[in-house]
């Protein structure tokens, strides 16, 4: 019996060892799935960055990056306050997605100490915003920069998604947005005898009033929808600054107006009291629509773009696309 017991014990021990090996194999198989595609190298505006693990603690230093990461289901541990928002705080349209996000200072001068204290494993920004502090940032965590902001927002999303390992999710969201934009354009043309109306974008800031052209975030969205632009904005540039005496350049079938921060700091009052403004066809036809600056100008991502689509549908008097 003792020999049999010893044999049985040997079998039991062997089986347990095999089971343990099997469990280890499952664990090994599961680990890559949790961080599939990592480590990886990401080429960007400042060079190439090695990201060893799927990022979990992300800091974003501009609004486009904030829109992108929250759209992809990530609540950043830290973010900057928008540079046009002097009262501080994050964009209202993203408030539900940044409840635990820490403010790391203004966009123009992010607080390096606050960022370091958050122990991020990825930092996202752009060369145009933060080239001067890139070396400090990359000393804290892997840092990925796009070249600039605004017009290349779709390309920027691809870079951010690559750094996060969420390329498929980003592409699916972009496809859905572009489908909505095209559907809206078709509905608008149906209502206007097959012809797309012209759309103008006016922004009042602390300085000369701006007319936004084709190479801007809002300009790309208008193009996706298929709206035409007035001559002053049908240009492959970001924007045109105008004086109150040049505001007639803003006229179009639909005029969308945003105000950056405090209206008292802008020329809004002077412009809209000007006879030239009152003489615009859009003003006379009640086709001027004030829309949120934080989505039309500062959003620079799919979530903001979808809200622009919603605003245009409402202004054009057509159903909001699904």
Model-inferred region functions:
Residues 84-88, 130-132, 147-159, 196-220, ...:
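Extracytoplasmic ligand-binding site segments that recognize negatively charged/polar headgroups
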Residues 119-124, 142, 251-255:
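Proline-aspartate-enriched helix->loop->beta-strand connector
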Residues 253-322:
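Structured C-terminal subdomain patch of bacterial secreted/periplasmic proteins
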Residues 5-13, 21-40:
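Short, low-complexity, disordered segments immediately C-terminal to signal peptides
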């Amino acid at each position: 019996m003792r020999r049999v017991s010893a044999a049985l014990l040997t079998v039991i021990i062997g089986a347990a060892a095999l089971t343990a090996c099997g469990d280890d194999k499952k664990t090994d198989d599961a680990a890559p799935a949790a961080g599939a595609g990592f480590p990886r190298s990401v080429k960007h505006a400042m060079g190439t960055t090695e990201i060893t693990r799927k990022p979990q603690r992300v800091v974003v230093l501009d609004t486009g990056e904030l829109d992108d990461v929250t759209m992809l289901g990530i609540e950043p541990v830290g973010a900057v306050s928008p540079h046009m928002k002097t009262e501080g705080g994050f964009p209202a349209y993203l408030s539900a997605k940044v409840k635990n996000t820490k403010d790391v200072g203004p966009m123009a001068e992010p607080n390096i100490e606050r960022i370091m204290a958050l122990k991020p494993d990825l930092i996202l920004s752009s060369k145009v915003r933060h080239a001067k502090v890139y070396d400090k940032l990359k000393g804290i965590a892997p840092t990925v920069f796009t070249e600039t902001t605004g017009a290349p927002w779709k390309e920027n999303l691809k870079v951010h998604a690559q750094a996060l390992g969420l390329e498929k999710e980003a592409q699916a969201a972009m496809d859905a947005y572009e489908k909505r934009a095209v559907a809206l354009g078709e509905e608008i043309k149906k209502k206007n005898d097959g012809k797309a109306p012209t759309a103008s974008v006016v922004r009042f800031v602390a300085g000369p009033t701006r007319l936004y052209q084709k190479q801007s975030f809002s300009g790309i969205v208008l193009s996706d929808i298929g709206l035409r632009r007035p001559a002053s904005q049908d240009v492959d540039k970001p924007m045109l600054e105008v004086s109150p005496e040049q505001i007639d350049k803003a006229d179009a079938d639909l005029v969308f107006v945003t105000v950056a921060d405090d209206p008292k700091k802008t020329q809004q009052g002077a412009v809209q009291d000007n006879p030239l403004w009152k003489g615009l066809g859009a003003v006379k036809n009640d086709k001027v629509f004030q829309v949120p600056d934080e989505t039309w100008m500062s959003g620079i991502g799919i979530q903001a773009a979808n809200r622009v689509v919603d605003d245009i549908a409402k202004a054009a008097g057509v159903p909001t696309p699904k």
